[in-house]
Amino acid sequence: MYAGYMKNNFLSAFGAFICISILGYFNSYQEENLWLIAPFGASMVLAMAVHESPLAHPKNILFGHIFSALSGVLIYSLLGLSYISIGLGVGLAIFVMMVTKTVHPPAGANPIIAIMGAKGIGFVLMPVATGASFIVLFAIIYNKLLKRKYFTFKDWSRLPYSK
């Protein structure tokens, strides 16, 4: 039993290693485009270690990151950089994720990055949407190969946060 537990832990860590390394590789060869942001590390913890959690489902990872990044870009474009705008960006991201039933805690950091980094709408596409899409596809394939339960796009209507 302990061996199976340790094997599962290793496979979770190995999956995160592979995915983040690939994003890091893309990042190192494209100086004009960022592929990797810190919240993706936390997304991998959910997608690999607690893959059955509603917070780790593809819909939550993808749209949680996108909506949160959009929240940060919007607040920055309206208010600029201040401690109030940073707090408002995170608060708006949480509100939007809750309303859209796409709560993904790592995505809560995206507005901070967007506002403090003075990011524009391009930040939402690259690295956020592109990287989150890669993570979702990787998690679906990796978890399927390991015969783990992991929700796919066809399962979105059955998610607890989808109703």
Question: Where are these predicted regions, by residue range?
Answer:
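Alpha-helical transmembrane segments and their membrane-interface boundaries
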Residues: 1-66, 70, 74, 79-87, ...
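Pore- and pathway-forming membrane helices of multi-pass small-molecule/ion transporters and channels
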Residues: 35-50, 90-120
